[in-house]
Amino acid sequence: MRFLRGRTQRATKITLPGPFTMALQCVDEFYGDQEALIMAFAEAVNAEALDLEAAGADVIQLDEPWVRTDPAAARRHAVRAIDRAFEGVGATRAAHLCFGYGFVVPDEKPDAYPFLEELAASSLHQISIEAAQPRLDLEVLRALGGKTVMLGVLDLSTPEIESAETVAGRIRAGLAALAPDRLMPAPDCGMKYLTRRSAFGKLKALCDGAAIVRGELAGRQ
């Protein structure tokens, strides 16, 4: 982080695995209690987040895809764990939810999250969600309070590069539920399974699609 901070004046962002997701993927042979395990991970993540902020991170994101696998447990523990992980952190606080890498889960995905609206009660500033591949029902975004939403508008299950107009259409759909200052267009998830050419092309389409919508919004003022 210090290396990066020393070489750019732009905002920096770094991601960390979320405490809930880590807890649900490990075998507990010590605590014998799910809540204690989750909160222990949250405490460890908090120490890392504080160090990253001190080193210059502007945005810190927790990846919490596993809240979808046990929504009942997520309702009991996830918000408190996320807030504990960010306790004392002044940087922009974000969390990412998805249904799995598109390359790994290329087929039909749910069109709704079993755990999402609950994050309105968290201390998060931003919520990142996969929406393009699963064709998410975006009405749920209205329930996220004043959070900024990083809306997935790039389908990463295919290397095919979207047109700028396709991306613009997905952004417009998000704007039907959110004010422009609360929507950040983004890829659905990580792009590590794409070729460099495909990833670059998709990111360019993202920029071009956002520019189209930005121009439309400016024309209405």
Label every model-predicted segment.
Residues M1-Q221:
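Domain-level signal for soluble alpha/beta catalytic cores
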